[in-house]
Regions:
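Bacterial N-terminal signal peptides that target proteins for export
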Residues: 1-6
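Bacterial N-terminal signal peptides
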Residues: 8-15
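Residue-level hotspots at or immediately adjacent to binding/recognition sites across diverse folds
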Residues: 22-361
Length: 361
């Protein structure tokens, strides 16, 4: 959950059992194109609706949106949210989007869900938290009206939320019991992901076991499954994505700077019930965000099949053509929190100082 602030991650690359792009001429690195986000505030989350319409969000109440594939971005600050951080964004068009905020003041009402239906000109607060111990890490939607929001556990219970009308939010009363100390990480808005019309997965850490919480029926019932990712009071599973109902990848690590080589990933081919560690990605620190190249969350193509990208903020970024069997670094890419794709040729990384990179395979 990053507990109000993230520990700075070390900047370095380490040798591991991966392939090198220069050694395999048939592998072509993606094209990376910097774009002007319209803000210098740090960006934390990104959501492409399609190759043209993309939303991103971040610090100081900031959001930014493009309707031309990133040639131009229009940034704004939500009134009344200037002291908040938008740790997640979900959007459905150039006009309809949701933002999820946290704060640093300790006020539980700093967690809010905002919605715009006019492209960010005006925003409505849909939900404001009053649980003094809740800390919400991310949210995800199946449709413009159906979504879930996930919180760290409180007294052994996850006070998660669900909307079925895109307006009101209710408690999910049947979440799996939490392990002692279990929480999630608000690093990129990707500790929660949806797929299809009713599937969702949540990545957790903080306890002795990093787990995946999964639903197949839109949040009516849930199951908890163990992963082999290392977990600790400062580590665990940070980010998860599925390219279909069965095949997914989870990434994590540890925020402890004494453990810089902690990044790990695992894959599942049975909907998250069982997981197998992959070769470690060539990044340092924890993996903040990851995404399949052909698909992000609830939709998109799948042209590159098993290809995916991971980013570890200051620890660099890397991509895999085969779900973690082999890895290639993205040279010079550092300081990015989140990555998401509308299609293989239309992906975006967002990060510190308002930086945006378009990534195209």
């Amino acid at each position: 959950m990053l507990k109000r602030s993230l520990t700075a991650l070390l900047i370095s690359a380490f040798a591991c059992a991966t392939l090198n792009a220069q050694e395999h001429s048939r592998i072509h690195q993606p094209t990376l194109t910097p774009q002007n986000s319209g803000t210098t505030n740090g960006l934390i989350a990104v959501w492409p609706v399609n190759p043209q319409v993309v939303w991103a969000s971040g610090r100081a109440g900031t959001f930014t949106v493009t309707t031309d594939g990133g040639q131009t971005w229009r940034a704004g600050v939500v009134p009344g949210a200037e002291m908040l951080q938008f740790r997640d964004v979900q959007a459905f068009s150039a006009t309809v989007a949701y933002l999820m905020s946290i704060g640093t003041s300790g006020d539980p009402t700093d967690f809010r869900i905002y919605k715009t239906e006019d492209g960010g000109i005006t925003w409505t607060i849909q939900f404001e938290n009053h649980n003094p111990n809740a800390f919400y890490d991310g949210f995800a939607f199946w449709t413009p009206h159906r979504g879930i929001a996930h919180s760290d556990s409180v007294n052994g219970v996850f006070p998660d939320l669900r909307t079925t009308d895109g307006t009101t939010w209710q408690d999910i009363s049947n979440m799996p019991p939490a392990l002692p100390g279990e929480f999630s990480f608000a690093s990129s808005g990707t500790c929660v992901t949806t797929q299809g019309g009713r599937n969702a997965w949540i990545a957790t850490g903080g306890a002795t076991i990093a787990r995946i919480l999964a639903t197949r029926d839109g949040g009516n019932t849930w199951n908890a499954y163990n992963t082999p990712l290392a977990s600790s009071p400062s580590g665990g599973a940070f980010t998860v994505d599925f390219r279909n109902p069965f095949d997914g990848i989870v990434g994590g690590g540890d925020l402890d700077p004494a453990n810089p080589n902690s990044a790990d990933t695992a894959i599942s081919n049975d909907g998250g019930q069982t997981w197998t560690l992959t070769n470690p990605p060539p990044v340092t620190g924890a993996i903040f965000g990851l995404s399949y190249v052909g698909q992000t969350g609830g939709g998109g193509g799948n042209n590159l099949g098993r290809a995916g990208v991971v980013t570890a903020n200051d620890g660099g970024a890397a991509w895999t053509p085969d779900e973690g069997n082999t890895w290639f670094t993205l040279p010079g890419v550092s300081g990015f929190w989140a990555v998401a794709f509308a299609s293989p040729k239309a992906g975006w990384l967002v990060g510190t100082d308002g930086r945006i990179l378009k990534i195209s395979f």
